[in-house]
Amino acid sequence: QEAPKAFNQCQACHKVEAGEDGVGPSLFGLFGHKLGQAPGFKYSEAHLKFAQQTVDEPFLTKYLADPKASLPGNKMVFAGLKNPDDVKAVLAYLKTIK
């Protein structure tokens, strides 16, 4: 599946290939895993504090819309996707990256 236009903001820092980190960790196989699990990536204390959080649709819906409110203290500079259709498109795309 082709990445939606809204995903361009994510690609500024994240890669979708397994084990290929950018400024942020790879998003490959993100769904169903716990936060802060990409091997070798140095996560913020905020991500480590929420390391038991499973990355699922309810969590990512909130996180993509407002990362700072969903995960206080995280280092991501991304302000969030304000359009709910963009959030849905990015979620659908992320589910295919595995």
Swiss-Prot record:
One term under GO cellular component: periplasmic space
Entry superkingdom: Bacteria
One Gene Ontology term from the biological process aspect of the record: photosynthesis
Modification Pyrrolidone carboxylic acid, positions: 1
Intracellular or extracellular location(s): Periplasm
A Pfam family per the record: Cytochrom_C
Disulfide bonds: none
Binding site for heme c: 10, 13-14, 76
PTM info: Binds 1 heme c group covalently per subunit.
InterPro entries registered for this protein in UniProt: Cyt_c-like_dom (IPR009056), Cyt_c-like_dom_sf (IPR036909), Cyt_c_1A/1B (IPR002327)
Signal sequence coordinates: none
The family this protein is said to belong to: Belongs to the cytochrome c family.
Record's function text: Cytochrome c2 is found mainly in purple, non-sulfur, photosynthetic bacteria where it functions as the electron donor to the oxidized bacteriochlorophyll in the photophosphorylation pathway. However, it may also have a role in the respiratory chain and is found in some non-photosynthetic bacteria.
Protein name from the UniProt record: Cytochrome c2
Native species: Rhodoplanes tepidamans
